[in-house]
Curated annotation (Swiss-Prot):
One of its GO terms (cellular component) is cytoplasm. The keyword Cytoplasm applies. The gene is GRXC6. It comes from Oryza sativa subsp. japonica. This is Glutaredoxin-C6. Keywords: Cytoplasm, Disulfide bond, Electron transport, Redox-active center, Transport. Disulfide bonds join 23-26.
Length: 112
């Protein structure tokens, strides 16, 4: 049931970040998306009644147990390091633009 819920959530928005409110790596990724002007859906696992079940389902689905767990256009991107690396390589904005999360006139990278 948690896996179905996770997949449904990922399909419901161009960008989904599974997060924990106290996690500094999660804050960093969400701040980057905000700086880029990207719209995203953040699911705070520590605020969800089934948060631990969702985190286990995400680990089963993606092989990643840690947060943040980032999805763009339904595709698993990874965590904080993966997302920052895509940004540093100039690949994040095109992914976000293709997903419809930002307008195509946005900056190409933000130094985090």
């Amino acid at each position: 049931m948690a896996l179905a819920k996770a997949k449904e959530t990922v399909a419901s928005a161009p960008v989904v970040v599974y997060s924990k409110s106290y996690c500094p790596f999660c804050v960093r990724v969400k701040k980057l998306f905000e700086q880029l002007g990207a719209t995203f859906k953040a699911i705070e696992l520590d605020g969800e009644s089934d948060g631990s079940e969702l985190q286990s389902a995400l680990a089963e689905w993606t092989g990643q147990r840690t947060v943040p767990n980032v999805f763009i256009n339904g595709k698993h991107i990874g965590g904080c390091d993966d997302t920052l690396a895509l940004n540093n390589e100039g690949k994040l904005v095109p992914l976000l633009t293709e997903a419809g999360a930002i307008a195509s006139s946005a900056k190409t990278t933000i130094t985090a």
